[in-house]
Amino acid sequence: MTRPTEAEPVAGGGSEAMVAISDPGEVGRATQTRGDRLIVQLGNLFAWLFPLLMVVIVAQVALRNLGRVGVGPGNQAWMDDLQWWIYGAAVLVGVGYAVTTNSHVRVDIFYDGFRPAKKRRYDLFGLAWLFLPFVILCWDITLTYALQSIASNEGSSSPNGLHNLWILKSFVNVAFLLIAAATWFAYCRLLARLTWPHWWKRLLFALPSVWFAVQLAIWYAAAGATILLTEAETLRDATRTAFFDEVELLPGQDAKITVLVALAVTLALIGLAYALRDRSKDGVRGPDAEAA
């Protein structure tokens, strides 16, 4: 693993004086967007949860051991739950911070020797074709958990634990939206290092992620409309309507109608963005492409 660093001149230190910046949130700050800065600031804020977590852990250990000798209230179940709450919140926000600052774990055996343009292409593929679809999938899965937890007013498994567990599960779902936003901001920033980031390029070069997101939007919109306009009362009932069926494309090869509609909508959006692009920026290359 490598730690991001950046050398900058020291004010008044002469032409050769340099200082190394090792704070991941400050490395490359000049190229970060407002969205990037928001993610970094949230990461810095939630990082303070780790010292709090240490205090809670130490306090729980002390209470547990003192309780064994008859001193104090002993082990507190709510403090056990609190540790997971704090850890979960800090780590999930930290994932978005790591994506924005490129401070996640990476084995640099090959990557470190690549030219800047090749590095950016690998980064773009990893973010938009591998990581972002996974994050969107996690959001979709945890949405069901969060809604079920809210509906049942889920609490702790321990009578003395932290109840209202739906708060944590809802936060997990929202955190995946934050991670998705951080990934998109980083993707757009890196794309600008290679080429002018027209919207049609942003959508096309992130096709799996965009297609998946559009498909989910269509699926939930159609399910909601079905519940409102028909006798369907649940998502299970709504998804039994014809719009959610499969069609045969080839012998033995079926596809969901919602997936095909999402593909058509995605391609239409890309085409519209291409038609409305700023043609004066066609052919503009980013700094890393120029360096290649």
Q: Model-derived features: where do they sit?
A:
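Alpha-helical transmembrane segments and membrane-interface helix-loop junctions
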Residues: 2-113, 117-292
